[in-house]
């Protein structure tokens, strides 16, 4: 008989920290594997004051949901910005109308639970920079960099289908 799939967020392993430039910093604790998840991805994310976890983006395939646990912040989306506080839920279905970015505009860390479908392959677009990313073969709980195939490029650098053939 299987054991219940229960994980206490206060008893998770240490977070993996990510930082890039002046704008981006966050820590992430994957919780899908400890839960035994098979079709959904979960992680606990914390963003320090004045930072963002990720660039403004949207997914073509996967849907995301965020539950703000503590702190305050701001959601950037195609319609502008919206304030965030503890117990707010944010749903981001696939598509450009759900482009999103969470910014910690508060004075304490912003913590949230991130939940997503894990369909593969995935295509993500970054409207601010004109980039896109494609991943194929990403393992549940793995990072995009660990995918079997991954490319991040500028859309303007596209080539003709037969180029180089």
PLM feature spans:
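A short, N-terminal "cap"/entry segment at the start of jelly-roll beta-barrel domains
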Residues: 1-39, 125-165
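A generic structural motif
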Residues: 53, 63, 70-72, 79, ...
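Conserved short histidine dyad/triad with adjacent acidic residue
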Residues: 27-30, 43-59, 97
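Short acidic-glycine-tyrosine-enriched beta hairpin
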Residues: 79-95
